[in-house]
Amino acid sequence: MRTSQYLLSTLKETPSDAEVVSHQLMLRAGMIRKLASGMYAWLPSGLRVLKKIENIVREEMNNAGAIEVSMPVVQPAELWQESGRWDDYGPELCRLTDRHNRPFVLGPTHEEVITSLVRYEVNSYKQLPLNLYQIQTKFRDEVRPRFGVMRGREFLMKDAYSFHIDKASLIETYERMHAAYCAAFTRMGLNFRPVQADTGSIGGTGSHEFQVLAESGEDLIAFSDTSDYAANIEMAEALAPAGERPAATAALTKVATPNVHTIDDVAAFLSVAPTAIAKTLLVLAEADEHGKQAVIALVLRGDHELNEIKAEKLPGVANPLTFANDEQIKAAAGCDAGSIGPVGFAGRIIVDRSAAHLADFVCGANETGFHLTGANWDRDIATYEVADLRNVVEGDPSPCGQGKLLLKRGIEVGHIFQLGTKYSEAMKASVLNEGGKSVTMEMGCYGIGVSRLVAAAIEQNNDQYGIIWPDAIAPFEVAIVPMNMHKSERVAEQAQQFYAELKAAGVDVLFDDRKERPGVMFADMELLGVPHAIVIGDRGLDNGVVEYKCRRSGEKQEVAITEIVAMLKAKLGR
């Protein structure tokens, strides 16, 4: 591609509304332009990257035995009503009506559509397993679109859905797709980790996320420093402290703590560490047959944070997790929120494993402006349950039994689920088994955020000058930068020759034939992130050489004119 015939719309200044580096560089490099909140037009350079990522994903899906299909973006509401997600999905589901006042949705995902299709096309176990995928635009009406294409409302996604006669077949395909995801992200040159994850609104029994490690990531992942264990912090298990709980030695004493509300306030006022304090949070229970909701006390160590995903999965706890309001706190504990404690609390008490290991601890006295010191389990609180309630912290022992946990930020670029029969049962998708009996199909679903991958790759691959693309997903693999070619016929001729040879070898090459100053040309090529560059000048041609420049390492070297094309072909595997 010649720049004189290309839309190369680079910007010198960083747009003020771009928060993360990927958004800044995608705008500056002329990859995208904002159309509306969370919606972007892809310009040629951005689309070239998007297509390369899409092709890698397609190849790995085909290698895994998946078959490509295409489904409508607009979906009839009755399918979502049939699955039960019409009411459950929330305001992110964009709903619309046609001229006949029939309700539809803009598809955020396609479980309902694919299940409806397959239930009419597949009727025998002989047609299973079946794995179908598409690469298509999705729409989710995010409350706060941000970070460019990282969290947009419209985005490109690969979504696959598998159908099986039994759980064993589902697990086999799930593992094959897990391997395909790893292969795809490795080919893209990404530093990523597969992690155990919550199934969220999609549902199902088992789930893994694929996280690209980056400081700008919205997710926090925990992984062992010595094994391959990794989990989203929502799912990472916090083990109980080792050893026996210390014996009680202090008497239970009520002390006045006026105007003390937070854990830090209590610790400072009583001269104790937050680790010696038990904090109590009140949440609502599931409604009984009369619609009434009791209040449940969740107790954690003062320095730990409640893991809301773990909490809402506890038997009897309302889902979604709902914290008691001031009026409910007053009715249940008889005090303000800052003075709640487990001693004397009349309702159900669930204690985190670490908090259950405390002895002689400080807690609220269930009387506004007072706390208790010297509190102890069993002696002062007879009835309670113990569960894993907290977020893990760095340095916790790994749940796998090997090493300690490290915490890193990640960008979720893929998510796979073992759905089981959640959708197939609701939508009556069944087949006849070998014995002629009708059985509900087991399902899996597998998503990759194709457009998000562009931003994630930039978050990992950039410097002060711009993007540094891995070869496999770069918009162009080689840039030809001829110095003053419009004043030097031999520079122009040599550039033309390299361009023709590289194109013939199947290399994506950008020939900068603009009438621009060399500094502008170099800056644009670095901003765009072209991995390899040939710089041609009269002085070098006098000596039979050109300059090769590697974008990632910054390495520069003189290479013979007769050898540069072969060297580049070797680097690119051509």
Curated annotation (Swiss-Prot):
For this protein's source organism, the top of the classification is: Bacteria, Pseudomonadati, Pseudomonadota, Gammaproteobacteria, Aeromonadales
Oligomer and partners: Homodimer.
Q: Which InterPro entries does UniProt cross-reference here?
A: aa-tRNA-synt_IIb, aa-tRNA-synth_II, aa-tRNA-synth_II/BPL/LPL, Anticodon-bd, Anticodon-bd_dom_sf, Pro-tRNA-ligase_IIa, Pro-tRNA-synth_IIa_bac-type, Pro-tRNA-Synthase_IIa_type1
State the protein's name: Proline--tRNA ligase
A GO cellular component entry from the record: cytosol
E.C. number: 6.1.1.15
Q: Which organism is it from?
A: Aeromonas salmonicida (strain A449)
**What keywords sit in the KW lines?**
Aminoacyl-tRNA synthetase, ATP-binding, Cytoplasm, Ligase, Nucleotide-binding, Protein biosynthesis
Molecular function GO terms recorded = aminoacyl-tRNA deacylase activity; ATP binding; proline-tRNA ligase activity
- Principal subcellular localisation of the protein: cytoplasm
Q: Which domain of life is it from?
A: Bacteria
Task: Offer one Pfam family short name for this entry.
Answer: tRNA-synt_2b
Q: Which family does it belong to?
A: Belongs to the class-II aminoacyl-tRNA synthetase family. ProS type 1 subfamily.
**Localization in the cell:** Cytoplasm
The reaction(s) annotated as catalysed by this protein in its Swiss-Prot or TrEMBL entry are: tRNA(Pro) + L-proline + ATP = L-prolyl-tRNA(Pro) + AMP + diphosphate
Q: Which GO terms describe its biological process?
A: prolyl-tRNA aminoacylation
> Per the record, what about its domains?
Consists of three domains: the N-terminal catalytic domain, the editing domain and the C-terminal anticodon-binding domain.
- Described purpose of this protein according to its UniProt entry: Catalyzes the attachment of proline to tRNA(Pro) in a two-step reaction: proline is first activated by ATP to form Pro-AMP and then transferred to the acceptor end of tRNA(Pro). As ProRS can inadvertently accommodate and process non-cognate amino acids such as alanine and cysteine, to avoid such errors it has two additional distinct editing activities against alanine. One activity is designated as 'pretransfer' editing and involves the tRNA(Pro)-independent hydrolysis of activated Ala-AMP.
